């Protein structure tokens, strides 16, 4: 080396001042760091799992400083030694692994823990004393080796924190063969586990013993299969075997969750009564079930209006919780199935009361006689009287057949569910009409038809009077015949 160049000494802080100051500023610039990080793929925009963008100071500043320090330290032997990089960035970057191009016998690769999985130790397993029927055959089980980068000292420290050993693969929750099912605590009747609990149970009753089912107290109920009734499996124990035997069970071994449909759900004040005579009507569980079932399928808002529940912030939720207690299901966001009428707001007790009062008014206050006389005067022609009388008689007979049919209606109403008399086809149609009208329909129609029958009766009487007035001879003949009959009867 020429003496001129040999006398030149490279200062220690050449990267901090001098011609290489621009290089240090260039490496520490944030824009250049972002550009180089994106070019290297560290912060790819379209990657499925984008990594965190590293700060330029963490990526380039130690590298630039270490580069010039290495040139200063390795000027004599010409070898680039980069292990000093860890000393430069030791304070802010202690977790960075040391870089070295020379083989090291004590080198251990960094440990990257797997994704977090909850670990349950075997000592805390309450079913460890029970033979696992779903466990794999140990002869065919493939043991998984430990991670090569797991130090023994770190394993002992981690085991103290997690109360388990990560080296046992069969204890991990992800590899536990019993994770897909659970045993119910009811099966463990004694301290001996399943041995004493399942020994007394038949095989066909095992599915029923798994679930918690409350015992049925009323054995004489008969509930139709409706969608609003919650259903559950029947618990066939010895204590309630007699009670369950009398309950109708369908093919799926399910029964209605409503224990007593005749139980009073709430009392509702009437809408149509005056303030001086306010009356309350009792609403049974069966009536609430009919409001939630077809054809109406009322939602929580409409049902709350029928039951006169005050509007509140959590009114729908509280109503659903109250219905859940009696075994009725009212899903949130339900849409009504039928059009809302004025009869929808009436409970069945008030609707029947209204129909009864309507029938009483039709029976006592309808002007059947005045209407009959008025219409008969419009048909005073003697040639039409015979034909008209026959028409009135035929109409009266048809009305009688119609009222007799409605009298045989056995639709469920209130807490009564009578046995049907009519055929199922016509009875289902009448039941639909009564469910829509809350029990007002059939009695109201009967009251109206009864008023029509009263008109027909008065019309026939008026026609007889008109016929006798137009034919006085027939009247005298009839009177003579009647007098002769009376004399014969006296003799």
Swiss-Prot record:
Gene Ontology MF term list: chromatin binding; DNA-binding transcription activator activity, RNA polymerase II-specific; DNA-binding transcription factor activity, RNA polymerase II-specific; DNA-binding transcription repressor activity, RNA polymerase II-specific; RNA polymerase II cis-regulatory region sequence-specific DNA binding; transcription cis-regulatory region binding
Locate the region Disordered. 74-161, 468-491
Spans through the membrane: none
PANTHER family according to UniProt: TRANSCRIPTION FACTOR AP-2, TRANSCRIPTION FACTOR AP-2-ALPHA
Enumerate composition-biased segments (Basic and acidic residues). 482-491
This chain's source organism reads Ovis aries (Sheep)
| Name the UniProt record assigns to this protein | Transcription factor AP-2-alpha
User: Its GO biological process terms?
Assistant: bone morphogenesis; cellular response to iron ion; embryonic cranial skeleton morphogenesis; embryonic forelimb morphogenesis; eyelid development in camera-type eye; inner ear morphogenesis; kidney development; negative regulation of apoptotic process
């Amino acid at each position: 080396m020429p003496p001129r160049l040999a006398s030149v000494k490279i200062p220690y802080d050449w990267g901090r001042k001098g011609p290489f100051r621009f290089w240090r500023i260039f490496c520490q610039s944030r824009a250049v760091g972002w550009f180089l990080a994106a070019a290297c793929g560290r912060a790819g925009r379209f990657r499925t799992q984008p990594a965190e963008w590293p700060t330029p100071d963490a990526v380039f500043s130690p590298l630039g400083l270490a580069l010039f320090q290495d040139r200063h330290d390795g000027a004599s032997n010409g070898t680039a030694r980069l292990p000093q990089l860890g000393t430069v960035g030791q304070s802010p970057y202690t977790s960075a692994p040391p870089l070295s191009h020379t083989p090291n016998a004590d080198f251990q690769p960094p440990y990257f823990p797997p994704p977090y999985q909850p670990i349950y130790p075997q000592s805390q397993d309450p079913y460890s004393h029970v033979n696992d029927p779903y466990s794999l055959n140990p002869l065919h089980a493939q043991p998984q080796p430990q991670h090569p980068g797991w130090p023994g000292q770190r394993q002992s420290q981690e085991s103290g924190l997690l109360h388990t050993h990560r080296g046992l693969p069969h204890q991990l929750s992800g590899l536990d063969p019993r994770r897909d099912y659970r045993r119910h605590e009811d099966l463990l009747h004694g301290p001996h586990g399943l041995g004493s609990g399942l020994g007394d149970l038949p095989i066909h009753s095992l599915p029923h013993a798994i679930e918690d089912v409350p015992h049925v107290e009323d054995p004489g109920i008969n509930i139709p299969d409706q969608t609003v009734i919650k259903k559950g499996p029947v618990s066939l124990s010895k204590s309630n075997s007699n009670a369950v035997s009398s309950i109708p069970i369908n093919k799926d071994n399910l029964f209605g969750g409503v224990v007593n449909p005749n139980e009073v759900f709430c009392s509702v004040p009437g809408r149509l009564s005056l303030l001086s005579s306010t009356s309350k009507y009792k609403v049974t569980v069966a009536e609430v079930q009919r409001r939630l079932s077809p054809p109406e399928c009322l939602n929580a808002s409409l049902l709350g209006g029928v039951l006169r529940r005050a509007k509140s912030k959590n009114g729908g939720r509280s109503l659903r919780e109250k219905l859940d207690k009696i075994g009725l299901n009212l899903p949130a966001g339900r849409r009504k199935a039928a059009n809302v009428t004025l009869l929808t707001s009436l409970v069945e007790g008030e609707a029947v009361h209204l129909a009864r009062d309507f029938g009483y008014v039709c029976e006592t206050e309808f002007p059947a006689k005045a209407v009959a006389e008025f219409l008969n005067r419009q048909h005073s022609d003697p040639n039409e009287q015979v034909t008209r009388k026959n028409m009135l008689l035929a109409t009266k007979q048809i009305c009688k057949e119609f009222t007799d049919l409605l009298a045989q209606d056995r639709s469920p109403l209130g807490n009564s569910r009578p046995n049907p008399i009519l055929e199922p086809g016509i009875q289902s149609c009448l039941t639909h009409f009564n469910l829509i009208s809350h029990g007002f329909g059939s009695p109201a129609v009967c009251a109206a038809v009864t008023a029509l029958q009263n008109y027909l009766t008065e019309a026939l009487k008026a026609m007889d009077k008109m016929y006798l007035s137009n034919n006085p001879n027939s009247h005298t003949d009839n009177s003579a015949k009647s007098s002769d009959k009376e004399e014969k009867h006296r003799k």
